Amino acid sequence: MQDKTSHFYGDREIQALEGLPKITMEKSSTLCRETLLRVIPAIIDKDFESFAKGLTNIQNLMGEIFFNAQNGSTFSSPSVGKVVSNLAENFEIGSGQSSWGPTGFAIFKSNDELQKALTFLKKNNVLTNGLRLDVTCARNRGYQLFKSGR
């Protein structure tokens, strides 16, 4: 989901980055632990629940770090934050924000869950004007390395 009305770049971004608090050793350790001991093993084990929880924990912690720069929110866009919050309260998802946003994301275990969530969002008038939803699928295959002919 992307809020076309909220952008964070240029001088505003530079000022915000300069004003961020230092990341504490505790938060840094938590980010490493979630990544190395939860997210990566969950990917290997195809354990959606652990993957989603770890990803969301990482995103929430990063949102705390950027909280003051984002007007007291873990999301730069209140509209995106509202959608993600509603989804997280009602569905098992992995969620977060890309960089400063305004793009947020929600990862679902199945297409059926996604369809239920889309119906829920429409039925409960959670979506606002200026918010665009894009639905994509995971590649579900490993990386590929190519040797350049250069």
Predicted regions and their residues:
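Generic low-polarity alpha-helical segments
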Residues: 2, 8-9, 83
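C-terminal domain-closing interface element
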Residues: 1, 15-16, 146-150
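Active-site rim beta-loop-alpha module in soluble metabolic enzymes
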Residues: 6-71
